[in-house]
Amino acid sequence: MHLKLIGLCLAAAAAMQHAPAMAQAQTQAPYKIVTASERGTYIQIGRDIAKFVAPTAGIDLAVLPSAGSAENVQRLRYEPGVKFAMVQSDVYQAFLDQDKGGNVEAGVLIRPLRVIMPLYNEEIYFIARADSELEFVHQIKEAKINVGPLLSGTAMSATTLYRQMFNGPITEVNASYLSNEEALVKLTVDKTLDVVVVVAGQPAKLLVDMKPEARKLIKLLKFDASQPESQAAVKTYFPATVRAASYPNLLTEDIPGIAVKAYLVTYDYGLGSTVAQLRQFARSLCQNFAALQTSGHPKWREVDLSLPELGRGWLYYPPMAREIRSCTAGKRVAVPSKTCTQQERVLGLCKQ
C-alpha cells in the first residue's frame, strides 16, 4: 500500500515538473493554413511556412489540403482556426467580379478577405496523350477536357482560359471535374478524355514523380502566344517557360507555357490578440525569408517582399503590410435562384 502511495506521489511530482513545458506548448496559437492537393505546390509552400515562419511567430500551424483556391476562400471565411489561405489571382478576381455583378454570397465571402503578399506564378499544364494530334493549347477547342474538381483553382483557370480563348464556356458534355489522378487514368487508359489541365508551380510533384515511361503515354501542350486565341488569354495570365530541367522524364527541351499568380491571403481581423499574432507572423516571414529561399521549395526564389500595388478591389491587410514594409526597409530584402453559370459552379456559388 505504501509503495502504491509513493508511486502516486512520484507520478504527481513528475506531472508538475512537466506542467510549465506543457503550458508553454499550449501558448502556441493553433492556426491553420488551407492549401490544395497533397501532390501540389501549395501544400509544400504551406509546409515551408509552418517550418520556417510559424514557430518564431509563436504559431502552431496546421497545413491542410483542400480542393483548391475557391474552397480556400470559403474555408478562410467560415472554418474555425483557418487564418491563412493560398489563393490564385483569377479565383480572387472572379469572386470580386461576381460581387460586382450582384452575387450577394460572393460579396459576403470576398469583401472581408485581405492579401498578405503575392507569391509566385503557377504554371498551367495542358496534358494530352502522347499520340494525340494536339500540340498547342489553342487547338483544344471542342476537346473533352478535365478542368479539375469544383471549388479548385485549377477549374477556375481552365474554364476562364477556355472562355477567353474561344469566346464561350466549355460545353458541359466536354467538361469533367475529376482529380488529377482520376483524370490521367481516363486520358491514358480509358481514352475518354483528350486533355487534363493541372495548375502547379514547377517543379510540380505530380509531374516530377512520373517515370521515364510516361513520355510514351503523355505530353505537355505548348502555349503559342502569337496566336489570336492566346493573345486574349495573356490579358489575365502570364507567359511562362516550362523547363526540361524540372521534368527530365517528360521533356527534352523547354517549352512555352502560361501561368497564374498565387497569393497568400488572410481575413480582416480586428481582435487585438489576433492582430498582434499576425503582426508577429509578418515579422517572422520577413526575418526568415532568406531561409525560405535557400531551404524551401524552389518557387520561393521567385517571391518578392516588396508588396506591389494591387488591382482595384484588392486590399492588403494593413497590420501585416506595415510590418513587412518596415522590416524590408530595414533589411533590404530582395526579391440567386437562376441558371448557374459555369464560373459560379466552379466557385461553389451555385445552390441548385
Protein language model regions, located:
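Extracytoplasmic small-molecule ligand-binding "clamshell" domains
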Residues: 28-34, 41-87, 250-254, 346
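A structural signal for short loop-to-beta-strand junctions that line the ligand-binding cleft
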Residues: 105-119, 124, 247-255
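Pocket-flanking alpha-helical
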Residues: 50, 62-106, 183-187, 203-211
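C-terminal segment of classical bacterial N-terminal signal peptides
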Residues: 13-22
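Pocket-lining segment of extracytoplasmic ligand-binding domains
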Residues: 89, 164, 169-272
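Bilobed "Venus flytrap"/periplasmic-binding protein-like clamshell domains
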Residues: 30-54, 122-186, 190, 307
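Segments of small-molecule ligand-sensing domains
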Residues: 251, 255-352
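Extracytoplasmic
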Residues: 28-30, 40, 56-58, 68-71, ...
